[in-house]
Structures are given as structure tokens and as C-alpha cells.
Amino acid sequence: MTVIQRWTSEHRALLLLLGVSALMLLLGLGSRELWGPETRWANIALQMLQSGDYLDPYLKGSAYYDKPLPSYWLITATAGVLGDLNHWSLRLPSVIAAWLSVWLVYLIGKQLFSQTTGLIAGWMLISTFYFVFWGRVATADILTVCGLLAAVWWYWRGPDDTRFSRYCVFFLLLAVSSLLKGLIGFVLPGLILLPHVLSEQRWKRHVNVRLCAALAIALAVYLIPFALSHLYGAASYGQSGLGLVLRENVVRFFQPFDNLGPIYTYLLYLPAYTLPWAPVWIIALWVALRNWRHIEPNARWLVWGLALLFVFFTASGSRRSYYVLPLVPFAQLLGAWWVALRLQQRKKVVGRGWKVAFGLSCGLLLLVLGVFYPWSNGGGGVMQFGQDVKARASAQAPWDDWRMVMIEVDNKLPLYVQNDNQPFYFVSEDQDYPRQGDSAALMAWLDKTSGHHFDPKRTLIFAQHRSGDPLPLG
């Protein structure tokens, strides 16, 4: 095979992987109703777009600086490009991050071992149920995975390179990753790369002024959104972004206040989150440990790095199933190393059996996540309710003429009844609003508490009503 033929074959294989990955992440993406944590990102992004305040995140009208701002900014920016905040603009940042993660796993596998290893790792990752599932969900979790992989890939491009530019890019990747979910964007790359940095006293080469200068620049970049919130945000906001960073990352680690999973949580969920390929990486781990002195150094680093990440997450007092997501690509990479090693020992290319297995797994996931799941969650419910409200209200006046009042509503609702009028007015359940009497008393209360006039003929009031309860203002 000539160099040109080999280059063409390699790139054709990569394009197939990336093309299938895009299909699996995009098919049916806009059909499924909001789910679970997506509602928080949808509500906060919607209120930013409605109010024009991108420095003070609010959830249903209340201050909610639970995550750094850039994860919301990605959604609002996508909404600006697509022209609307909807399922597509909400989930597209996660989809792009998941797609890039597949590419990055391929690149890391190719750098560490071989192109065959990279391709197998990529196919394993994109045919992993929970990776694809979370890649189609609007949260910051897959964004963090992508940031971790980007930092690891950049490091392995030149682990002994001490140029200032190399340090700058590396630490900026860490800063940006930390701005998407939290300080684990700094911690996880440092942990997984630590064994390699310590080996052969490599760390001595990297203790220099250039590294310190690059780290200072990255820290300055990291602080920019918090500084903007402090300097230009609403004076009455009442929450500190940096204070909540410490609470959500440091306090939660040592003194957890929720998500109190048992210490064996990740012994259960790491295999579950790597299905259907969990047996492969478990066998690979066993093979690596049995032949520790004889396997290549990069394989030993991978085992050490995976172990450190596992210990870190287990040591945290706050544990949830999906916290294990950053380990998934590296577990699959370990499995791919073993498969490629077996193929090399037998002097075979990726056989028909593996291709069929990847194809069946991808096809099944495509049917479940791209067709069945969106279909089963795409009709009725809050989505249909929003369409019905729009139809009935638009029969009386243009939809954009209506103002919305939300009284302790379902988190899903605001996205489905948005318009181009003034921002929604949220009323919490503990506020002393009129619950009995007529609507005139409620309208007067709204005018008084909001400082704005609500036209009764152009105001829609949403409140949760449970079956059997008396009707509000009945």
C-alpha cells in the first residue's frame, strides 16, 4: 500500500467514525421533551435572553449561580445563531462536545498506541449507551468530558515541550473547562497526567517561570466571568459566583450536603456507564496488571490515570451515577488498547466480528435514543400543553402581545410558552399572593409587587393544579 493509499484509507475510516457519530448524536434531537436537569439550563438561558442580563443567572425568578456562566452562554449564543431557544439550540453545545470527544479519543489513542487503537476507542465510545445519552442532554457534563480530553490530547502532543505557548494553551483549556461546570476542569487533567509528569523526573523540566506565567494568565481568564458579574451584575443579586464555586466544589467534596451515594457507587456505575464494552476494559485491566512490567509505558500510564480518577471520585463525599462520565473515555481507551494488542499479536486488522459488533451496537442505540425515545417523549405532556395555550391565546390576540405570570410552575413549562414580550414574572409558592377570591385581587397584587401593570386581557397566569385540589381563585 502506497503512502497516498494509506493516508486515504486512514482518513476514510476516521470520516466514517465521525459521520456515524454525528448521526447518532443528532437524529431525533429536537423531538424529545425536556428532561431532568435540562430544565435548569433551559430556564436560566431563557431568562438571560428575555432580560438581556447575561451576568446574573436566575432560575424561575430566583438567583441561581449553581454553575459558572459560560455553559449558559454557549446555549444563548447557539440560540442567537439559530434564531430561537428550542431543543436544538439547547442541546447542540453538548452534541458538539460529545462529537469532539469521539475525535479526541481517536487522536489520543493514535498518539499513545496506534491508529487502530484510536479507531477502536472511538467506536467503543460512540457505541456506549450512557455516553450517547448524556451527549444528547443539555447539561455541562459532556462539556467537561470534552475539556478533559482536549487537555490530555494537547499534553500528549508534546509532553516534554516546555515552550510558553504550549503551557498557555494547556492551562487555557483547563480554565475554559473549569468555567463550564466547576474546578474539576483543573483537577481532573492534573490527576490523570500526574503519573506521567512524575515518571522519569519529568516534572523538573516543567518547574519554570514560563509555566507559572501561563498558569497566571489562565487564572485571570478563569476569573473574568466572575469579575464581570461582580462589577456589572445587579447589585441586588445576592449570590457570589466564586462563593458558590467553593461551595459546589470544595465544600461538597469534604462536607457533602446532597447526592450522598454509598462509597461503592462507582464500582457499580463505571461498568454500567461503559456498557456494552465494560467486559472489554475489565479484561484489559486484568491483562495489564498481570503483565505490568512487560506492557508499554503508555499503557501503564493509562491504568494509573484511570485509577487516580476513580479514587478521586470515590473519595468525594458527594456521589452520583453520572459523575463517573469523565472516566468512560479512558476506560474504553484501555479496552481498545487490549483489543488492538490482540489483533497485532494475531497479525490481523479489525475483523468482521468487531465491525459487526460496533454496527449492531450503534444501530441499536440509534433506534433507542434517536427514534424510540424521542417518539415516546415527544407528544402530549408539557409540549402539547404549550401548543394548545398558544393556539387558544393567539385566537384572541397575537401571541407576542401576551404577558406570562408563572406561579410555582413545572420547570419544563417556560420554554414551551415563550414569546417576544416582556420577561416572565415568576411567583414562588411561599409568596403571599391571593389564593381565594377573584382574579382582580391577584392582578392588583401583581401590579403592586412587580411595579408594572398587567393588563388582565393580555395576561396568562400559569399555576400547578393537582387533581382533587380546589381551583385557584375558585
Go through each PLM region and give its residues.
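Transmembrane-helix signature of polytopic, membrane-embedded enzymes
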Residues: 11-15, 105-127
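Short acidic/glycine- and proline-prone juxtamembrane loop motifs at membrane-interface regions
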Residues: 87-90, 130-143
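Transmembrane-helix motifs of polytopic, lipid-linked glycan transferases
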Residues: 92-112
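Membrane-interface transmembrane helices that cradle and orient dolichyl/undecaprenyl
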Residues: 110-111, 116, 151-167, 177, ...
